[in-house]
């Protein structure tokens, strides 16, 4: 699973996800893309499960780019612990995702294979997603 090698702060503030994605909202590398339509904190497990689904359906053909990286530590306190006594320990890594942000890109596979792979991968994510195509001959479908 993805995690940063080192970070400046071990327990960052959570912050808020406001607005839409102004960066990473257009296809940069591949021919097809998986675009988020809602805001969410994607965990490294969800990103890895989606990556495995995409690569397995493409039968390891073509190329896959992961455009999000889980670089924020999410903390949690143990169950049945009294309030206070500081912030909890880092539990897992997450990536903040805003609406219209590109999550994955594909290249080197036919349109039908990419469409079905993205459709299957959408079940691994907790948000609604949309498929984008670089050339506008194919339809852009919400999955």
From Swiss-Prot:
<dbReference type="InterPro" id="IPR000114">
    <property type="entry name" value="Ribosomal_uL16_bact-type"/>
</dbReference>
<keyword id="KW-0934">Plastid</keyword>
<dbReference type="InterPro" id="IPR047873">
    <property type="entry name" value="Ribosomal_uL16"/>
</dbReference>
<dbReference type="InterPro" id="IPR036920">
    <property type="entry name" value="Ribosomal_uL16_sf"/>
</dbReference>
<dbReference type="InterPro" id="IPR016180">
    <property type="entry name" value="Ribosomal_uL16_dom"/>
</dbReference>
<dbReference type="InterPro" id="IPR020798">
    <property type="entry name" value="Ribosomal_uL16_CS"/>
</dbReference>
<dbReference type="GO" id="GO:0032543">
    <property type="term" value="P:mitochondrial translation"/>
</dbReference>
<comment type="subunit">
    <text>Part of the 50S ribosomal subunit.</text>
</comment>
<dbReference type="GO" id="GO:0009507">
    <property type="term" value="C:chloroplast"/>
</dbReference>
<comment type="similarity">
    <text>Belongs to the universal ribosomal protein uL16 family.</text>
</comment>
<dbReference type="GO" id="GO:0019843">
    <property type="term" value="F:rRNA binding"/>
</dbReference>
<dbReference type="GO" id="GO:0005762">
    <property type="term" value="C:mitochondrial large ribosomal subunit"/>
</dbReference>
<keyword id="KW-0689">Ribosomal protein</keyword>
<keyword id="KW-0687">Ribonucleoprotein</keyword>
<keyword id="KW-0150">Chloroplast</keyword>
<dbReference type="Pfam" id="PF00252">
    <property type="entry name" value="Ribosomal_L16"/>
</dbReference>
<dbReference type="GO" id="GO:0003735">
    <property type="term" value="F:structural constituent of ribosome"/>
</dbReference>
<protein>
    <recommendedName>
        <fullName>Large ribosomal subunit protein uL16c</fullName>
    </recommendedName>
</protein>
């Amino acid at each position: 699973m993805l995690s940063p090698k080192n970070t400046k702060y071990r327990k960052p503030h959570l912050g808020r996800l406001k607005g839409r994605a102004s960066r990473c909202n257009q296809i940069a590398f591949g021919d097809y893309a998986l675009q988020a339509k809602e805001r969410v904190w994607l965990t490294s497990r969800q990103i890895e499960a989606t990556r495995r689904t995409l690569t397995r359906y493409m039968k390891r053909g073509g190329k896959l780019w992961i455009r999000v990286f889980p670089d924020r530590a999410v903390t949690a306190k143990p169950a049945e612990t009294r309030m206070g006594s500081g912030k909890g320990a880092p539990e897992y890594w997450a990536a903040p995702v805003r609406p219209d942000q590109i999550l994955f890109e594909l290249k080197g596979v036919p349109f039908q294979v990419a469409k079905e792979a993205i459709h299957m991968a959408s079940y691994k994510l907790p948000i609604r997603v949309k498929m984008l195509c670089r050339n506008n001959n194919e339809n852009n479908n919400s999955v």
